[in-house]
Amino acid sequence: MSDSLRIIFAGTPDFAARHLAALLSTQHHIVGVLTPPDKPAGRGKKLTINPVKELALTNNIPVYQPTSLKPEENHEWIKALQPDVMIVVAYGMILPKAVLDIPRLGCLNVHGSLLPKWRGAAPIQRALWAGDTETGVTIMQMDVGLDTGDMLYKASCPITHQDTSASLYAKLAELGPKALINTLDLIISGELKAEKQDDSLANYAEKLSKEEAKINWSLSAQQIERCIRAFNPWPMSFFMLDDQPVKVWEAQVIASDNTNQIPGTLLKADKTGIYIVTGEGILNITKLQPSGKKPMASADFLNSKRDWFTPGKIIQ
């Protein structure tokens, strides 16, 4: 097999663009890029190009932006490029079997978990929320299922008690490109060994919703604190205070026997934070963001809104 593969790259966000950038520094030939149509963004709703398209145009790579890959006529662009392999990273569209079968070596996906754990749309956030101590990336041979294909390569990293989705995303954005290039090297050398997934060990990382981000004080302080880190930077955990949403950026778990207190009860608010009773333990909110304001230390917020935080008040 030639040392240089003809690659079509399919992706959208910065996470994907980092993988494309890594491939551009190799001996492989990126013959085309698939990415979704430009979307309106900002107040003016101007059409904006995503990071993958921007990188492709900078490097004079042909770009194709179909609204769907289901129509057969949309497959002709892919066929004409005669790819050895298609690499898919956070593309955001379904690839039908007819597309998966076009490249000589099929389609590879970079998935942000250690499969078969956390198949689905939000593996980074769900791993954090669940309290996992380890995650990573899996390079997978795509099939028609949802992240069910054979595993080709894995790279892992620890999840710390300080990690947010943003910091974990950054870790995986470092791991993924290296794992992908190693996988391609193994394919070329003929040393790659595929491993089937054990479906009995699989679980699903469902897409996040804004509704989930509202803090449920009946959960334990530990669960809520993990949720706060998992939902940072989107959609951001929040609570309601005098009918205003307040986003929570940072919090601490305080062990306490508070079984006689209603979850959501405000215990105290001082320069060290805002202490709220949960289903188990106390949550100390140390950094928050009132509606229409920038994130700030809780102590700074209290300077102007101390009257909002009367001990005994129930926080919604």
From Swiss-Prot:
Which EC number(s) are documented for this chain? 2.1.2.9
Q: Print the keywords alphabetically.
A: Protein biosynthesis, Transferase
> Keyword Lipid biosynthesis: yes or no?
no
Enzyme kind, highest EC tier: transferase
Coiled coil residues, start to end: none
Keyword check for Repressor, yes or no.
Answer: no
Q: Which residues bind (6S)-5,6,7,8-tetrahydrofolate?
A: S113, L114, L115, P116
Q: Name one GO molecular function term.
A: methionyl-tRNA formyltransferase activity
Instruction: Write out the catalysed reaction.
Output: L-methionyl-tRNA(fMet) + (6R)-10-formyltetrahydrofolate = N-formyl-L-methionyl-tRNA(fMet) + (6S)-5,6,7,8-tetrahydrofolate + H(+)
Q: What does this protein do?
A: Attaches a formyl group to the free amino group of methionyl-tRNA(fMet). The formyl group appears to play a dual role in the initiator identity of N-formylmethionyl-tRNA by promoting its recognition by IF2 and preventing the misappropriation of this tRNA by the elongation apparatus.
Report the sequence similarity comment from the record: Belongs to the Fmt family.
What protein does this entry describe?
Answer: Methionyl-tRNA formyltransferase
UniProt organism field: Proteus mirabilis (strain HI4320)
